[in-house]
């Protein structure tokens, strides 16, 4: 399994960095116009709403005592008008922000996916795929509302506070100061709770990621689980991971649930002080009933945006951990990329040279040590040797899926690190042992490497590699849906479709890495004619477990101990009676004993 297993938490020790939010703001800039409109609509609607207590004050102090029905009805009409305007503005603002939020999700997810497409194999080797998947889907969904509605609501609630404070001071300065006395207490409380919340929600992020990684792995490996009767053991592991999620979630929610009661407690204390002071001052005749009612209303209004800001604060703290993970992925270096002055690879003739190449996947073991060889255009080369010797590594370096640690890989005399990756790989046909089939129909899978291929070209390629026979018998022929990962196909059928896909791309260099491992011997013999057609005129590298399939190769290289131990034709190596001879005769003995 990947080095970062489902049991390992992804640790982020750095304190919250405001630069995360500043960087995230780049996704908001293109929608700034619509967001400004939304802010203005909400701001104007809110301002109208905060006039209501002053209207009520006038009704209590002027219209009702003087029995001025005309003024009273006018004030009531104003209240109704204010309500209608607020509802209209709020509805328009909501529609705008739904659109903005979905656009932000699209932009972040697109950038994240495009970056993942460019990351080298090493990145995927080191991480469970479930942990990558949760960032693209769940985390982006979580932060999108924070970046759209969250930021707008901060601005709006700050405006609301400003309007309320202004109106409070317009009504009565002394009583307004009493309302504001609770703000310092609130600031101390919010600073205390912030760090505890962030650490708690980071733990939630980690445990959810671990659970998702384990779940994804077990869904893919469900058949193996049942074959080895591992259901009970896997259920126990899943239960432990789920309990970790539950425990960290409960801890995080406990901290989050402190925010609202904390703010509410401060609010209640302040409003109680206002009420008591109002009773005393009203009794002394220094404050009117309308003033007391108005300032009490504004005191209630004052704490509402603060409570809303507390909720927004909660949401921000919850999602900052997700935002960090998203940017952590976006900042993952693309180690295999085009050089600054990379040129387009000319049409490949097929000469491949390894010039003193050294390579290791990590520092613990050197896979290739000072490897040098040259393959002429059109030559077929077989790579043989024990498991883990470096055969697949060699073909991966030719395709530039990894960078060499030392030396050079050249094609037609051109250092492949100095050409664009796209122009290199579009001229290569690479077929791995794991023949990946995408969801969709068979025709789309064969056309994958050549989107403009005609139906006739697809059928001809399939016939050449003996795939047309079984495809024609499928329920809908080439339009048959193969489901996710080609689940309705056998391994042999997947490999034949992959052969057709590779042949259709008409590569100059062909790489077959255990490409016939899942094909039965009878089909492989029938396929041999098609393979010969594929190899003709193309430089090819073949890794095969069944050595009988590579006897006719122009050159066979025995790879072991980080280098080329032997090289020559089948007859030459058999005559030497060295490494290849021992491997071939041992395999031949196994076949004879079995049959």
Region annotations inferred by a language model:
Residues 64-75, 167-181, 251, 255-324, ...:
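Helix-loop-helix
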Residues 338-339, 345-595:
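ABC-type nucleotide-binding domain
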Residues 1-49, 64-75, 93-97, 101, ...:
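Membrane-integrated ABC transporters
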Residues 35-89, 96, 169-174, 285-289:
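Transmembrane helix-loop-helix hairpins at lipid-water interfaces of multipass membrane proteins
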Residues 19-20, 28, 93, 97-101, ...:
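Juxtamembrane loop-to-helix connectors within ABC transporter transmembrane domains
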Residues 121-122, 138-147, 151, 155, ...:
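An intracellular "coupling" helix at the cytosolic face of ABC transporter transmembrane type-1 domains
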Residues 29, 40, 48, 52, ...:
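Hydrophobic alpha-helical transmembrane segments of ABC transporter permease domains
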Residues 3-14, 102, 110-140, 213-237, ...:
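Short intracellular "coupling" helices and adjacent cytoplasmic loop segments at the cytosolic face
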């Amino acid at each position: 399994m990947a080095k970062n297993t489902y049991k390992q938490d992804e640790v982020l020790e750095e304190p919250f960095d405001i630069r995360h939010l500043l960087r995230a703001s780049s996704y908001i800039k293109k929608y700034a116009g619509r967001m400004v409109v939304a802010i203005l609509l909400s701001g104007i609607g809110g301002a109208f709403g905060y006039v209501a207590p002053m209207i009520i004050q006038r009704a209590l102090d002027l219209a009702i005592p003087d029995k001025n029905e005309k003024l009273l009805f006018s004030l009531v009409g104003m209240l109704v008008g204010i309500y209608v305007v607020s509802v209209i503005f709020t509805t328009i603002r909501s529609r705008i922000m739904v659109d903005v939020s979905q656009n932000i999700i699209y932009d972040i997810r697109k950038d994240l996916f495009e970056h993942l497409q460019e990351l080298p194999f090493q990145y995927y080797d080191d991480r469970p795929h479930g942990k990558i998947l949760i960032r693209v889907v769940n985390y982006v969904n979580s932060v999108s509302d924070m970046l759209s509605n969250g930021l707008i609501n901060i601005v709006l609630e700050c405006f609301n506070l400003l309007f309320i404070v202004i109106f409070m001071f317009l009504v009565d300065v002394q009583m307004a100061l009493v309302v504001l006395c609770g703000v310092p207490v609130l600031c101390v409380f919010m600073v205390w709770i912030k760090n505890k919340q962030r650490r708690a929600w980071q733990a939630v992020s980690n445990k959810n990621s671990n659970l998702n990684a384990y779940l994804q792995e077990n869904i893919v490996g469900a058949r193996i689980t049942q074959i080895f009767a591992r259901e009970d053991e896997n259920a126990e592991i899943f239960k432990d991971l789920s309990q970790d999620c539950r425990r960290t979630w409960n801890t995080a929610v406990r901290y989050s649930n402190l925010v609202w009661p904390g703010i509410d407690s401060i609010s209640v204390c302040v409003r109680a002080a206002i009420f008591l002071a109002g009773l005393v001052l009203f009794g002394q005749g220094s404050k009117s009933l309308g003033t007391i009612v108005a300032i009490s209303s504004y005191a209630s209004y004052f704490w509402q945006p603060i409570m809303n800001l507390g909720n927004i604060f909660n949401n921000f703290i919850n999602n900052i951990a997700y935002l960090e993970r998203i940017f952590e992925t976006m900042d993952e270096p693309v180690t295999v990329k085009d050089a600054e002055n990379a040129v387009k690879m000319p049409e490949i003739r097929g000469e491949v040279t390894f010039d003193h190449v050294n390579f290791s996947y990590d520092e613990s073991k050197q896979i290739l040590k000072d490897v040098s060889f040259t393959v002429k255009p059109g030559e077929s080369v077989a790579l043989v040797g024990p498991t883990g010797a470096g055969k697949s590594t060699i073909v991966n370096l030719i395709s530039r899926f990894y960078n060499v640690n030392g030396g050079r890989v050249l094609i037609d005399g051109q250092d492949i690190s100095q050409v664009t990756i796209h122009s290199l790989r579009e001229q290569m046909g690479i077929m791995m042992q794991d023949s990946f089939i995408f969801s969709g129909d068979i025709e789309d899978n064969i056309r994958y490497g050549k989107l403009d291929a005609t139906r006739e070209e697809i059928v001809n390629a399939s016939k050449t590699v003996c795939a047309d026979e079984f495809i024609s018998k499928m329920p809908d022929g080439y339009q048959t849906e193969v489901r996710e990962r080609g689940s309705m196909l056998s391994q042999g059928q997947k490999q034949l479709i992959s052969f057709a896909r590779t042949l259709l791309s008409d590569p100059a260099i062909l790489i077959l890495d255990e490409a016939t491992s899942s094909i039965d011997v009878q089909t492989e013999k029938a396929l041999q004619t098609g393979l010969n057609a594929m190899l003709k005129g193309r430089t090819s590298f073949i890794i095969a477990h069944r050595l009988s399939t590579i006897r006719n190769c122009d050159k066979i290289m025995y790879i072991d101990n980080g280098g080329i131990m032997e090289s020559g034709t089948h007859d030459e190596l058999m005559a030497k009676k060295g490494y290849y001879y021992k491997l071939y005769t041992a395999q031949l003995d196994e076949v004879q004993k079995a049959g």
